[in-house]
């Protein structure tokens, strides 16, 4: 065996014996880098496209809802197979891990192809549904058409990166994602301005970057750099495995799916006021997503640790992993909230030098900062249930923030408060999600981790 490739038993020993803080930090750093790079190149799209016009900037927010749909299925299938893989490796069932990874990879690519076909066939009504006004529509159609063509590659990449993370090889996962993200940032100004492609150039830069990430991740598997194998011979013919992958990943599908729904509802609610309102909430959401990506990156370091140790029967280390993640995530959120609260105008001006966009976006950022420190706890309670295979509760928790709690707020608050109601809806949902998560965490620790 080459020296650079760690054996499954060595990896198992690392996951079960390394001190929890050191282990989670070591796994979180590459996942954080991956998350931040992903958000960074999405934010780069917003930054460069905002230089075109306010309507073009708003179109990025509209198409973000579509990208959330693609991510819902790709990331959901990836998280589903990742949870099964980490628990399988923890219990020394490597054959099941190979079968799960291979089946999930080809399944995700097929789902991405279906999304591509369905989206292209219904593009104009889909863009209207997601919040495009007549002035935003030409930009959103141009952007979405190219993004849809990349959907199969995007979905498959999510499975490959989650497979690497689930076996504890978060650093390898980071390489592919970061390379694609950095390429995206380099190509954006080239395609948008130098080649005069406008918003279509931003979409093409994103699609090509996703393809590069996929090729790099696939290379790692083809050259034996992973513990888990992905091969057509390992594809399962048993429908039950696909059902289990979807069942475990369903909380993520719900969470991301509701993120798409909430984004569409937010765009439609803001569009009542102006394109500037849509652009403002798009930019403020990108900033909020940047912080959330840090929280999720820590959680992606936490999940394989919890899965391995719970699968091996070590409840104490599972508890320690949860609380360390909560403390780390909360500290990060407090720092980010403080920085954003001090410089809201400067942040909005960075993206779009428009007084109306800044005025609306500033208030949205301040509302978000008020509840930001609660984000880590509710996120990790949800991830705890999901990575340990408690599907129904995980699905319920995942549906709260962007669905069960958010949808009523975005439908009611704007009618009562006007534009401030639009800005307060997501922070309100975050606060309520924290309250709902408390009894779930207390029950789980008393009955499953005692």
Residue positions per predicted region:
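Short alpha-helical transmembrane segments in multi-pass integral membrane proteins
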Residues: 1-31, 85-152, 194-250, 306-371, ...
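Transmembrane helical elements of multi-pass membrane transporters/channels
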Residues: 25-45, 146, 180, 209-213, ...
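Hydrophobic/aromatic residues in alpha-helical transmembrane segments
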Residues: 29, 45, 81-82, 122-123, ...
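Helix-terminus/linker motif at the lipid-water interface of multi-pass membrane proteins
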Residues: 36, 40-58, 127-134, 190-197, ...
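Hydrophobic transmembrane alpha-helices of multi-pass small-molecule transporters
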Residues: 69-72, 184-189, 214-218, 290-293, ...
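Membrane-helix interface/capping residues of multi-pass secondary transporters
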Residues: 46, 54-57, 94, 123, ...
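Short runs within selected transmembrane alpha-helices of multi-pass transporters and secretion channels
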Residues: 78, 147-165, 173-181, 202-217, ...
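Small-residue-rich hydrophobic transmembrane alpha-helices
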Residues: 57-117, 154-173, 267, 280-344, ...
